[in-house]
Design a protein with these regions (language model features):
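Acidic, polar-rich low-complexity tracts and alpha-helical solenoid repeat scaffolds
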Residues: 1-163
Length: 163
């Protein structure tokens, strides 16, 4: 019931109430996770709370909550790793972020999800001046995900030469 109340609060734009954890009457995602951490709903509550903490700019708290989430759903796991990577980027831990983006890009069989995180890993590699690694990611896009790319991977591969 507490998870459903948190979902309703989130749908109504009441993010603070959805996050909850401040009173027993409104446990929100945090309280639901704390009470039911070993269950699927508890783990999903940690994921949702992590996303809300990220939105608040509390990146370490968000990362810690996201880390507690697990699922057999491969797309959700890819999204988890991607969100954790965003936390690490905001904490200036770009090497860790790149590792998480690599995990995100291969966590799911969904082509768009894989494309999205492969592209992001390529861009982070470029920012870290890891041109060979960036080229690897952009070449993978060119080979596997042309339907989603609109020819941009060729531009990125060319950019690697001069960046």
């Amino acid at each position: 019931l507490s998870y459903l109340a948190a979902e309703k609060n989130l749908a109504d734009g009441k993010e603070d109430l959805a996050l909850g954890g401040k009173t027993a009457a409104n446990p929100g995602y945090l309280g639901t996770y704390n009470e039911y951490s070993g269950t699927k709903v508890g783990k999903l509550s940690a994921y949702n709370a992590g996303l809300l903490k990220f939105k608040e700019g509390k990146y370490q708290e968000a990362y810690d909550l996201l880390e507690k989430f697990s699922s057999k759903n491969k797309i959700l796991m890819a999204l988890k790793y991607g969100a954790m990577a965003d936390c690490q980027i905001n904490l200036n831990k770009n090497e860790d972020a790149l590792s998480l983006l690599d995990k995100a890009s291969s966590a799911s069989d969904d082509p768009y999800t894989s494309y999205y995180f492969t592209r992001k890993a390529g861009l982070v590699s470029l920012a870290l001046k890891k041109n060979a690694e960036a080229k690897k990611y952009f070449s993978a896009i060119d080979e596997k995900y042309q339907d989603y790319d609109n020819g941009m991977s060729d531009s990125y591969i060319e950019m690697v030469k001069y960046y």
